[in-house]
Amino acid sequence: MKEIAVLGSTGSIGTQTMDVIRLHSDLFHASVIAAHKSIDKLREQAAEFHPHAIVITDEEAGKKFLEIYDGDADVLIGEAALSEVVKRDDV
């Protein structure tokens, strides 16, 4: 299975990418999903796709996400987290 990092998973291209991953879940797994502020959509995606890590680049949105998220993925906040998360072995 190919592990995929979807940066901007809540945007137009990102949601289309998530659709492809959904259709081909035997081939792909969204191991990392990332968004700037769309934490409600990100929480929905996390519940469906069970990523290993979630990145929210906006600091305030990240704090709010931590209040509403009850999953077990690593949650990283801030722009620098994007460059760190793509270096993971599970991507």
Regions found by a protein language model. Give the residues of each.
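A conserved hydrophobic position in a structured secondary element of the catalytic/binding core
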Residues: 8, 57, 77
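Short, charged/polar "capping" segments at the starts of alpha-helices
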Residues: 40-42, 60-65
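A structured beta-alpha segment of the ubiquitous adenosine-cofactor-binding alpha/beta core
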Residues: 66-91
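Short, ordered loop/turn segments at secondary-structure junctions
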Residues: 11, 38, 59-60, 80
